[in-house]
Amino acid sequence: VGYTLANGRAEMASFFDLVTNHYILGEQSHTLFAGITTAGFVVMAVSAWKLLHDTESRYAFTQAIKAGAIYTMVGVVGVILSGHFHTQYLAQASPMKLAAMEALWETEDPAPFAVVAYPNMEKGHNDFEITIPYMFTIMVHDNIKGEVRGINDLQKEAVEKHGPGDYRPHVTMLFYSFRAMVGSGFFMVLVSLVVFYLAKKDKLFSAKKLLYALPWLVVVPFIANSCGWIV
């Protein structure tokens, strides 16, 4: 999008087309909400540390930790929604990447969602997997019916189109990076809900272990973001 091939290299033809294409818009919104999530969680972590060590500013940082919890929850919801729509776009624009994210080797209709898998790139299948039936098709098509193309078929298509070569990404890395990202997101929502509830009920100081844990948990959004960039 927004480029032409000239003398064996890509040259930009339209900056506007480049910055407004669907792929960029999907990633921009996903990244924006990830930033909001990170900011909210960092505010919670810093506020927890201040609540433990600065008793004179207790009211201010109680309000701050509630605001951080709200920011985190809003951010994660935005990440999930933008990620969902971007996933559906990837099914058309970058099906190999999508199939690798889910370790889906064969084209299936409906396609299951693998909760856990041990991908074997040499043999082109999963040596072990635990799946949820229909779930991957629902993610891609918003329906229990719909084909999702698998890695092996996409590899054959790529060879026919571009010539011999291995066009598969590192399936194991993509598969588990995606799950680490998603798992971190849901973990942050859970922590935020607990923090907000306790702060709202004025019971935050009865959960000292949580306050002590929060500064250490500040790494979670950065782990999620790093895994997201790998994906």
Where are these regions (language model features)?
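Polytopic transmembrane helical bundles with strong interfacial aromatic enrichment
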Residues: 1-231
